[in-house]
């Protein structure tokens, strides 16, 4: 029975870790308060007209407004799962139920990200991969620089900027 609980706890924690990376402050601009997608997204963004950049920014802002409640719920479920996983009196069914709830929230998040990809293609004219970045393309929970000097994510990111300055307009925005 203890080995089952440990195994379920490990599975649950692995789920939460991959969840946390996907649910962190999201995406897009290589500058600013979001994770960049690396050098190519930063270059693609800078190549857009000011009007297209404004549309890109508004789509990202709308996306963040939609997914912030999902992120909050994911964080609450993650915290609860951590607490239950370390409690020897927790029933495996409780952990299973919680991981199912987390999976449902992740699915909702990915749906919103896929909608963002479609909107970016249609309205801005660039192909993005927010829905498929998953745990490999995003920074994890915590501080640090994003992929192009943006805020959020773990580590220094793919493109370390001088003195913490972002690559665009000489500053983090």
From Swiss-Prot:
Tagged with keyword Signal: yes
InterPro entries referenced in this protein's UniProt entry, alphabetically: Metal_resist (IPR025961)
Keyword set, alphabetical order: Signal, Zinc
TM regions (residue ranges): none
Disulfide bonds: none
Family statement: Belongs to the ZraP family.
Protein name in the entry: Zinc resistance-associated protein homolog
Biological source species: Nitratidesulfovibrio vulgaris (strain ATCC 29579 / DSM 644 / CCUG 34227 / NCIMB 8303 / VKM B-1760 / Hildenborough)
């Amino acid at each position: 029975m203890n080995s089952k609980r440990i195994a379920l706890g490990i599975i649950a924690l692995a789920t939460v870790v991959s969840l946390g990376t996907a649910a962190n402050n999201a995406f897009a601009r290589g500058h600013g308060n979001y994770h960049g997608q690396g050098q190519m997204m930063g270059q693609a963004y800078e190549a857009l007209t000011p009007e297209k950049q404004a549309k890109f920014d508004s789509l990202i802002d709308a996306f963040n407004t939609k997914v912030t409640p999902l992120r909050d719920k994911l964080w609450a479920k993650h915290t609860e799962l951590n607490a239950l996983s370390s409690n020897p009196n927790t029933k495996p069914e409780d952990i299973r139920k919680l991981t199912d709830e987390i999976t449902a929230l992740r699915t909702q998040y990915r749906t919103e990200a896929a909608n963002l990809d479609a909107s970016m293609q249609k309205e801005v004219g660039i192909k993005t991969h927010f829905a498929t970045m998953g745990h490999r393309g995003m920074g994890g929970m915590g501080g640090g620089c994003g992929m192009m000097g943006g805020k959020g994510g773990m580590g220094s990111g793919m493109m370390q900027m001088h003195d913490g300055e972002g690559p665009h307009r000489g500053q983090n925005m």
